[in-house]
Swiss-Prot record:
InterPro entries xrefs: AAA+_ATPase (IPR003593), DNA_recomb/repair_RecA (IPR013765), DNA_recomb/repair_RecA_CS (IPR020584), P-loop_NTPase (IPR027417), RecA-like_C (IPR049261), RecA-like_N (IPR049428), RecA_ATP-bd (IPR020588), RecA_C_sf (IPR023400)
UniProt record similarity statement: Belongs to the RecA family.
Any one GO biological process: DNA recombination
Key words of the record: ATP-binding, Cytoplasm, DNA damage, DNA recombination, DNA repair, DNA-binding, Nucleotide-binding, SOS response
Taxonomic source organism: Shewanella baltica (strain OS195)
PROSITE patterns, sorted: RECA_1 (PS00321), RECA_2 (PS50162), RECA_3 (PS50163)
Gene Ontology molecular functions: ATP binding; ATP hydrolysis activity; ATP-dependent DNA damage sensor activity; damaged DNA binding; single-stranded DNA binding
Binding site for ATP: 67-74
Protein name as annotated: Protein RecA
């Protein structure tokens, strides 16, 4: 299609004017934007990284992680912080719930000496701290725990029983408008942990909703629904949880995928167990009876012993991890979908639509 040369000249002139006024990169053709290849940070779980499609959580975006109590929300964010710190990134934890356990964080691999931590008095203060850290351009990952604990100043200064209808939602809406652009410019990942509430009087569809209004749902590039699906036992003692994470919303890859992994108490995500399972599924690790072998060498009898071997030999674990990432991220459909999820589990949190 032939373009009018006068229009081309006018467009070139206005582009030069815009870049002169607002800076280089303020406007460009979509195909020229090299930043479309999204930089990511691992979640600590290989299967979740694959389910996300891009290999982890995207930098410069807002992410929401929600689920019931004790489902692993904070553990997952601490795993993200540990992964980011291993890459030399600076992280901050806004502890609005005043419940962060530094001993547990250290066990998960978090460098607590270099983790910035704030325990704000009000929701406005927490969000202003987020904005200041973002605009500095010096912080790579910020975690807010949690949206439900971001209490507006008016509510704190008022009396118990006073009505503050929609105050938290307005606060979050204003904060999202302010933060979204700054996050993109500074390439900062902002993770909000959220809790679940029940809608009153819902007869059909899913009665669950998240706190803080609708703004976060719209501005989040990724929303993760994390659930505990079972217990892991060592004899009669419960030592961890079977966990399922569903990608409810994803703006950087295809949504609605899910991942299953184990969270062990005091240890975090069971990476080596995940490597053994995925390695066997994709024929990187051979299994004969109860014995597991890698490249012809036996690595253990039983899944637990094979996982222990990989823990003691991190070079081999890294090699398997790298091979699996190359295989699965180039072909995400290779990660077999779990067919045992119930219809109720596959209901969109907001619309009630089955997917």
């Amino acid at each position: 299609m032939k373009v009018d040369p006068n229009k081309e000249k006018a467009l070139a002139a206005v582009l030069i004017q815009i870049e002169k006024q607002f800076g280089k990169g303020s406007i460009m053709k979509l195909g020229e934007d090299r930043s479309m290849d999204v930089e990511t940070i691992s979640t600590g779980s290989l299967s979740l990284d694959v389910a996300l499609g891009a290999g982890g959580l995207p930098m410069g975006r807002i992410v929401e992680i929600y689920g019931p109590e004790s489902s692993g929300k904070t553990t997952l964010t601490l795993e993200v912080i540990a992964a980011a710190q291993r890459e030399g990134k600076t992280c901050a934890f806004i502890d609005a719930e005043h419940a962060l356990d530094p001993i547990y964080a250290k066990k998960l691999g978090v460098d607590i000496d270099n983790l910035l931590c704030s325990q704000p008095d009000t929701g406005e203060q927490a969000l202003e701290i987020c904005d200041a850290l973002t605009r500095s351009g010096a912080v790579d990952v910020i975690v807010v725990d949690s949206v439900a604990a971001l209490t507006p100043k008016a509510e704190i200064e008022g009396e118990i029983g006073d009505s503050h209808m929609g105050l938290a939602a307005r606060m979050m809406s204003q904060a999202m408008r302010k933060l979204a652009g700054n996050l993109k410019q500074s390439n900062t990942l902002l993770i909000f942990i959220n809790q679940i509430r029940m809608k009153i009087g819902v007869m059909f569809g899913n009665p669950e909703t998240t706190t803080g209004g609708n703004a976060l749902k719209f501005y989040a590039s990724v929303r993760l629904d994390i659930r505990r699906t079972g217990a892991i036992k060592d004899g009669d003692e419960v030592v961890g949880n079977e966990t399922r994470v569903k990608v409810v919303k994803n703006k950087v890859a295809a949504p609605f995928k899910q991942a299953e992994f184990q969270i062990l108490y005091g240890q975090g995500i069971n990476r080596t167990g995940e490597l053994v399972d995925l390695g066997v599924a994709h024929k990187l690790i051979e299994k004969a009876g109860a014995w597991y072998s890698y490249k012809g060498d036996k690595i253990g009898q039983g899944r637990a012993n094979a996982g222990k071997y990989l823990t003691e030999n991190p070079a081999i674990a890294t090699e398997i991890d790298k091979t699996l990432r190359e295989l699965l991220l180039s072909n995400p459909s290779a990660l077999a979908a779990k067919d045992d999820a119930s219809t109720e589990d596959n209901v969109d949190l907001e619309t009630g639509e089955v997917f």
